């Protein structure tokens, strides 16, 4: 039987949807300046790479069943439970954006944590699935930072193109 959902788990169910991260990216790209657009680009690239690594490379290699109770409220996913692809891509997006806009690290990480907690509470994933997904996301963002260092624009400076 699925566990009773708390307010955090309910919020997490909303936050675990990829369109939410697309909305965050859209607002940053439209309302922000050069740094925000750079953050969206970095976060988006990290998101796509982590999703590929978790869902296309690793999931087919690991045959892990979903936790008991998975799919009671809807159809059970047919892919392996390990690792959590949502967690991998969400974490990569958050860590990627935070490299360019460090002030967004805490609110984005809080939203992602709520989403990942709901994956556990709703019996969609084991704790280790979510931890592994987070590690993949962090690893992708780390490799991206080393291969494509963030561009630092001093506060108040106008970057090329007129944005900040």
Q: What name fits each language-model region?
A:
Residues 32, 62-63, 122-123:
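Short helix-capping/hinge motifs at transmembrane helix termini and TM-loop junctions
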Residues 47-59, 112-118, 141:
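Alpha-helical transmembrane segments of multi-pass membrane proteins
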Residues 29, 54, 58-63, 98, ...:
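Membrane-water interface at transmembrane helix exits
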Residues 17-26, 86-94:
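Core segments of transmembrane alpha-helices
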Residues 1-25, 38, 55-81:
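N-terminal transmembrane-helix/juxtamembrane module of multi-pass inner/ER membrane proteins
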Residues 7, 36-41, 123, 127:
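Hydrophobic, aromatic-rich alpha-helical transmembrane segments
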Residues 29-52:
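Interfacial segments of alpha-helical transmembrane regions
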Residues 71-164:
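Membrane-embedded catalytic cores of phosphoryl/pyrophosphoryl-handling enzymes
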């Amino acid at each position: 039987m699925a566990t009773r959902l708390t307010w955090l788990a309910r919020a997490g169910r909303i936050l675990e949807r990829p369109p939410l991260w697309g909305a965050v990216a859209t607002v940053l790209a439209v309302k922000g300046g050069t740094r925000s657009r750079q953050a969206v680009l970095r976060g988006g690239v990290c998101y796509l790479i982590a999703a590929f690594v978790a869902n296309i490379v690793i999931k087919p290699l690991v045959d892990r069943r979903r936790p008991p109770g998975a799919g009671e409220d809807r159809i059970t996913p047919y892919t392996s439970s390990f690792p959590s692809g949502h967690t991998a891509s969400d974490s990569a997006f958050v860590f990627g954006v935070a490299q360019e806009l460090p002030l967004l690290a805490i609110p984005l990480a809080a939203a992602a944590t709520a989403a990942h907690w709901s994956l556990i509470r709703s019996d969609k994933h084991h704790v280790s699935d979510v931890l592994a997904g987070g590690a993949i996301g962090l690893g992708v963002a780390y490799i991206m930072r080393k291969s494509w260092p963030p561009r630092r624009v001093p506060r108040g400076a106008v970057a090329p193109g007129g944005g900040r």
